[in-house]
Amino acid sequence: MLKREMNIADYDAELWQAMEQEKVRQEEHIELIASENYTSPRVMQAQGSQLTNKYAEGYPGKRYYGGCEYVDIVEQLAIDRAKELFGADYANVQPHSGSQANFAVYTALLQPGDTVLGMNLAQGGHLTHGSPVNFSGKLYNIVPYGIDESGKIDYDEMAKLAKEHKPKMIIGGFSAYSGVVDWAKMREIADSIGAYLFVDMAHVAGLIAAGVYPNPVPHAHVVTTTTHKTLAGPRGGLILAKGGDEELYKKLNSAVFPSAQGGPLMHVIAGKAVALKEAMEPEFKVYQQQVAKNAKAMVEVFLNRGYKVVSGGTENHLFLLDLVDKNLTGKEADAALGRANITVNKNSVPNDPKSPFVTSGIRIGSPAVTRRGFKEAEVKELAGWMCDVLDNINDEATIERVKAKVLDICARFPVYA
């Protein structure tokens, strides 16, 4: 018999200590990694529920195991909410991650060796959009497109490459691009050569749900996303589509199960259902609007302090600082800010002279700080502190002064009050 009073603290002190230290780190550090966010206690309650015990291979109403009548309700709620939130008529909520969702799309639509047009990782794309170290780059013939001199996606180049290479699929989406993507233009290019348009909206799904960023679902053949990042749910993936192509939907379902995965994680799917409901609330729209405002406010400070922002600004939740002119590496900047309890990630910038392990830039995102209540005044102050650190990167006294300010503002704006 399992007793409800069982706990980790009494049983595994070593593990519990690490968990508690991570909790403190999240409260006492300012999180600016663009792909990170804080999920709600409701989502965590779902993920720590007895749903974790249930195997449910298959889909609602078509399971390979008995006893699925209640998890069917859970999964159907998640499916229906995903479709409603993004205006889709198909949703698969089972992918364990965004990469798994992307893998399923490749598997459903392509054969190994097919040509794919994807955004260059060094110019803002994602590993799963064709990086040679990823399955996408190993199994498919990848043709990369990029950005122009202004830092915007070069649609003329994309159209030219599409016409020349005749890819079977074009991928829209990014991990480090601060502009607005013209999904309709991408579909036009795809249609001109008879290619699929697949959009990975993982980074901007929350903004899209709130109407702050254009929705790709009406334009793409298939859309994927993570359920964390701006959507602020549990770590997981989601596939969406619109257009009524039932054969395509069957292929997508089969590509997730049984092709790529076995049993779905029902406790995570419950967490997704909670997060999708939260994303329909009026306060979620206000939150996402503030995410965009905060990113713009931070960019303004960096520009005024003489820092180069890739593409000159941001139209979403993230932006890149190009530190080449400052003679700093992304690795150095990441480490120095980390010592001041400010967490960012080093990131390659266009035409980066440094390796991906060193880089010449950092990526900054506003979702997590906005989640804890920061508005323009706080993020402007924060951006100023970051400039102080970067201007004096070897001055530990400056870093300690900034760290003290960070600890103070974190205490005033707790993640979990």
UniProtKB/Swiss-Prot annotation:
Signal peptide: none annotated. Belongs to the SHMT family. The record marks H228 as: Plays an important role in substrate specificity. It comes from the Bacteria. It comes from Salmonella schwarzengrund (strain CVM19633). One of its GO terms (biological process) is tetrahydrofolate interconversion. (6S)-5,6,7,8-tetrahydrofolate binds at L121, G125, H126, L127, S355, P356, F357. Keywords: Amino-acid biosynthesis, Cytoplasm, One-carbon metabolism, Pyridoxal phosphate, Transferase. It is found in: Cytoplasm. Catalyzes the reversible interconversion of serine and glycine with tetrahydrofolate (THF) serving as the one-carbon carrier. This reaction serves as the major source of one-carbon groups required for the biosynthesis of purines, thymidylate, methionine, and other important biomolecules. Also exhibits THF-independent aldolase activity toward beta-hydroxyamino acids, producing glycine and aldehydes, via a retro-aldol mechanism. SUPFAM superfamilies: PLP-dependent transferases. HAMAP family: SHMT. Pathway: One-carbon metabolism; tetrahydrofolate interconversion; Amino-acid biosynthesis; glycine biosynthesis; glycine from L-serine: step 1/1. This is Serine hydroxymethyltransferase. PANTHER family: SERINE HYDROXYMETHYLTRANSFERASE (PTHR11680:SF50). Its main location: cytoplasm. It catalyses: (6R)-5,10-methylene-5,6,7,8-tetrahydrofolate + glycine + H2O = (6S)-5,6,7,8-tetrahydrofolate + L-serine. The gene is glyA. InterPro entries: PyrdxlP-dep_Trfase, PyrdxlP-dep_Trfase_major, PyrdxlP-dep_Trfase_small, Ser_HO-MeTrfase, Ser_HO-MeTrfase-like, Ser_HO-MeTrfase_PLP_BS, SHMT-like_dom. One of its GO terms (cellular component) is cytosol. Homodimer. Its cofactor is pyridoxal 5'-phosphate. It holds the Pfam family SHMT. Its EC number is 2.1.2.1. The modification N6-(pyridoxal phosphate)lysine is found at K229.
